[in-house]
Amino acid sequence: MAEAYPGGAHAALASRRSSFRNSLRRLRPTEKPDTSFMRGVWKYEIFPSYVRVTNKQVLQLDAQCQELPPCPSVGQILSFKLPSFSFNTTTYGSRYFTVAFLFFGAEDNEVFLKPFFVMHSDQDIVLSVLNPRSLFIEKGKFTWYIVPIRLVKNPYLYLQILPGQSDIQLTRSCTQSGDKLNTSEPQIFLSGSPVTSQDECLPYLLAQHTPPFLKSYARIHTFPGKVCPVNAIRRGKGYVRVSVDTPDLKREGPLNVKVGMTLLDDVIIAFRYNPYPKSHWRWDGESTDIRYFGSPVIIPPNFITELEYNNTYEAPLSSKITAVVVSHSSNPVFYVYPQEWKPGQTLKLTVRNISNNPITIVTGQSMAQAFFIYAGDPSISTIMRRYIQRQGCALTLPGNIVVESSSLPTFERINKTFNGNIVASEGTL
């Protein structure tokens, strides 16, 4: 099990805040690229912390064309400025943060470029459009960007400990044992048969409210490739209720469910509910699946509908963390439009059936991916918007998230850090 986020996490986030405040003092007129070149139909302009790409020729599209003309890999593009550029999200960064490259189109493009993240410099690039149609795009009228984004790592399942919704008479509890009880991260293990009640849609384990449950968060002991039975944790006066949901709950006869957790005071991101209902926990730390939970929904061909996603998350150590939700780029059946997922808020997913057949969305189905990003101070977004057209020093990411370009990590810094010329630290990502 990983360590909890100690004081180092606070120091890392404090460094981010200082860096972002300093960047606001450097608002400058329209930026000029460090390097520009042409390859195929595209003109590439490389700035210190992003790449702007425009069509240097007329683009002729048709209704069967779902891909734009090809482009080189990130490594090949940036080699025009940094000949030895190389990068891999998995091995870059620190315990808390890493960086990935976000590809997305400008808001005023005539066709919508599906946004996606690139995790290493040699990755093949496929530029896919939504709802292709026959049209000519004039020279210089289609723009897209490559932007390095700080991602917040989330490789473990952290849940909030929620307040109990009703009073419960604790006449019988499950077995409870503990370990490391005299440390700041006590571990609790529950074992017993789930019970049901009218006010809970899921069965649950009922346990005594022992001192470790005074903490605010729990890291659930789960494993990659396994279905985690824990859905949510609630505490009330004298009791703790752990909602559980596994395929085994449907079988007849007594069932014993075992749950382990580490109780914590500080985390970077914690969910209200397990974001992986009835599905395997994906242990990569770079994104979190958005999985549907609810009654089945049928979407006719080429229709758009809205689906409620009632999960929320907290980012207690920083107000600068938000999430951008993007559809799976390889999904041939439906598309989820990108949007921002703010802490403490639920989502309304706008889902489009892009197939020729009706589709049914069921509980546990993966809809999209949430990438948690360090986007800077949310209170200054309105100010930034005023500079987008006038000074050209801010970028609007998918989901209408505005970032100031000088607050982004630079390509030079990424290259030096990854190749060992700079020792990675929380303040240099």
Curated annotation (Swiss-Prot):
Name of the protein described by the UniProt record: Protein LF2
InterPro entries: Herpes_Orf11
Sorted UniProt keywords: Host-virus interaction, Inhibition of host innate immune response by virus, Interferon antiviral system evasion, Viral immunoevasion
Assembly and oligomerization: Interacts with host IRF7; this interaction inhibits IRF7 dimerization, thereby altering its function in immunity. Interacts with BRLF1.
Record family assignment: Belongs to the epstein-barr virus LF2 family.
A biological process term (GO) from this entry: symbiont-mediated suppression of host innate immune response
The keyword Cell membrane is annotated on this UniProt entry: no
Coiled-coil stretches noted in the UniProt entry, renumbered to this chain: none
The keyword Protease is annotated on this UniProt entry: no
Domain of life from the UniProt record: Viruses
Protein role: Prevents the establishment of cellular antiviral state by blocking the cellular IRF7-mediated innate immunity. May also inhibit viral replication by modulating BRLF1 activity.
Pfam families, alphabetized: Herpes_ORF11
Species of origin: Epstein-Barr virus (strain B95-8)
